[in-house]
Amino acid sequence: MKVFAKKVFKGENPNIKQWDEPTIRQFNGKEVYGRRTKGYGTSEFNYAGKLYKPEPWTEDMELIKSKAEKWASEIMNRPIEFTFCLCGLYETGDDSIPHHSDTIPTLDDVVLGVSFGGTRVLEWSNYANPIKAHTNTSQVDLNNKGEPETTQFLVEDGDVYMFDGHSQMKTTHSIPPLIGCQRRISLTFRSGL
């Protein structure tokens, strides 16, 4: 399952006052310079080699989280609770994420992303066969999987996208570099942690 919707969160503002500094790490044999990030919630989360011990939800983040849970619960037709949010700052068009598959605890858990600020492209690549052994990993095997069908979506201020563990078994996604774009904040809420 994957869902994209326009302007659901238009007018909201996470008001993140202080960001954690980025880290440099290896990803698919390449050195990747990360973005500035911040973690909020009640559960720890390991992302890109860093263990996030989240800050408590701020009032602004709690409002957005509640709206995200309500929206996700309506789409999924069952209660959804988000226990962690990874906030990412894209200061310029050089800030990007290569194609990857998210770690999701179970096939039924969900990730919901909300975009604030500048417009970016979200690339979504679908493979015919599974690219992961199980959903609770970000390790992918693209050998002999064939060419993916890739779709691009413009992600604008207030837009939301959501996917579950089932979708991550056969897909990757990325935010490629984009020259001349404005500052963007991404909130990625997670269930099942």
Where do the protein language model's features map onto the residues?
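Non-heme Fe(II) oxygenase metal-center motifs and adjacent flexible, charged/small-residue loops
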Residues: 1-193
